[in-house]
Amino acid sequence: MAATLATMMCLSSFSMMNVWADKKEDSEPLVINYISARGETDAALKTLKKLAEDYKKDHPDFEFNVESIADRETYLQKIKILASSNELPDWFDADPEAFFEGLCKKDLIYSVDDLYDELGIKDKFFDIALNYPKLSGGSNYLMTWQGNVEYFWYHKDMFEKAGITETPQTLEDLLDVCKKLKDAGMTPISAGNYDMIMRYPAFKAFRLEGNDFIDNARMGKEKFNSETGIATAQYTQDIAQYFSEGWTSSDTTAQMDLFLNNGAAMLYTGTWDTPDLVDDEGNLKDDISMFKLPVDSEGTATGENDYYANCGIGTAILKDSMSDEMKDFISYVWDNFADTAMYEFNMLPSMMPSDPEKLPELTQQIL
């Protein structure tokens, strides 16, 4: 009896080993094809590539293939063509807008809400990283890599040369500062013809009505010939005269270069650009400082501590591409992303780094 039992146990063990071996043999190497709207120098993309290289050390068959298309119009056109021919990549970047929502409704995209629950990591993210990418129905299908706050960045020396002793407190003050800079022979604002330029028309509306005006206008419930719409148009016209020359043909890189080379006194952008604005220790370069979006002297809907924050463009995962191997890689990414992004690439990530006390002074100020 004992011999029979031992034989059965050996056979059972051998059978289990064979099943496990078969599963390992059936498991295909993980290959992720990722089309990104981020530029090659983007800190989030650099972080992902670094983590993919590290992951590959223990998973030699793993491949992380990235195609970067920084021009947003070209990028969107390609994604729409791929979607129409049912050839979307494993990963691709998207915003929570109508086209992407349509893909989600067709059940093509894996739920990030479900993914974070499955990995047990949802509570590690900043609230904005979970709320900003939500679709109109409240669900989330996008991984977000950044925790961004938007500021006006300025050269202290240029302000001083123009006789400006304090940063503008109101939108009207901002126009006065621009005039002083221009009268002193300087270019007030470095601007570029890409999505951030649309912040300027939104400033006045945001201060007068919060997000309601833009949200309602987007849904056709508000018109731009209303009192707020007219005030918004007038302010945009007033401030546009202080944009850098040739801004309509300038992109984000040229806009940053102009500012860094003292070609303009101010730049409005988010903390995703801090790698260009800080020194090796992660602190702002000596001549650069920042101020929040000024309030409006007449509007009371939003105050000085209400300003634009976002988590950047998100990344979607094709539902048919999801696998246990994919989840293992994503789990590895999120276990290491925050520290790698913050301490190696000076980027504020979408979740808190492991040791907040080590954060640069600028980052602590933002948080």
Where do the language-model regions lie?
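Glycine-centered hinge/linker elements that transmit conformational signals in sensory
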Residues: 178-181, 218-249
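Conserved N-terminal structural module of periplasmic/extracytoplasmic solute-binding proteins
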Residues: 2-6, 11-101, 105-106, 119-123, ...
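Hinge/lid segment of periplasmic solute-binding proteins
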Residues: 95-151, 175, 200-202, 228, ...
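Short, solvent-exposed loop/beta-turn-alpha elements that line the ligand-binding surface or hinge
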Residues: 111-125, 209-231, 279-283, 292-306, ...
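Extracytoplasmic/periplasmic substrate-recognition and gating elements
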Residues: 30, 53, 57-58, 63, ...
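Long, aromatic- and glycine/proline-rich binding clefts that accommodate carbohydrate-like moieties
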Residues: 291-295, 342-367
